[in-house]
A protein has these predicted regions:
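Short, flexible turn/loop "capping" segments at secondary-structure junctions
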Residues: 1-2, 44
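Short glycine-/aliphatic-rich beta-strand segments at the starts of folded cytosolic domains
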Residues: 2-17
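Hydrophobic pocket/interface hotspot
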Residues: 6, 18, 22, 51
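Short amphipathic alpha-helical segments
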Residues: 14-37
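Short acidic, gly/pro-rich beta-turn/loop elements at beta-sheet edges
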Residues: 16-18, 52, 61-63
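Short, glycine- and small/hydrophobic-rich beta-strand elements in well-ordered beta-sheets
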Residues: 30-58
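An amphipathic, aromatic/His-enriched active-site/gating alpha helix that lines ligand/cofactor pockets
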Residues: 32-36, 56-92
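Short, low-order "capping/linker" segments at domain edges
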Residues: 87-106
Length: 106
């Protein structure tokens, strides 16, 4: 099992819009994630988002970020997230500090 932790920041005042976007997750994006067996949870704390995801492999996870639907979603999210000079969301990988149980093997 592949696990992934990332953090990124919301633009000021965008938390409600971010939540709504995910409450109304595009069906074609959800279908891609389900097909790749990606499970995900995102937590919020003081303007920072923390993503934790699992997938059968890194390749499965990365496939969810490919194709026109993923590109459109990234462009949509760029309006809510802090971005670099090219307009891409600034995503920082999290180093795993501890794992227990099923996560210890991944």
């Amino acid at each position: 099992m592949y696990t992934r932790g990332e953090t990124f920041r919301l633009k000021p005042g965008q938390y409600a819009a971010y939540q709504q976007a995910h409450d109304e997750l595009w069906p074609e994006l959800a279908a891609t994630m389900l097909a790749q067996q990606v499970n995900m949870v995102i937590y919020h704390h003081e303007g920072r988002l923390f993503l934790f995801a699992t997938a059968p492999s890194r390749e499965h996870f990365e496939r969810t970020h490919q194709g026109p639907v993923a590109r459109r979603w990234a462009e949509y999210m760029a309006g809510m997230l802090e971005t670099d000079t090219q307009g891409h969301a600034v995503v920082e990988p999290l180093e795993r500090a501890f794992a227990f149980g099923a996560f210890a093997a991944g």
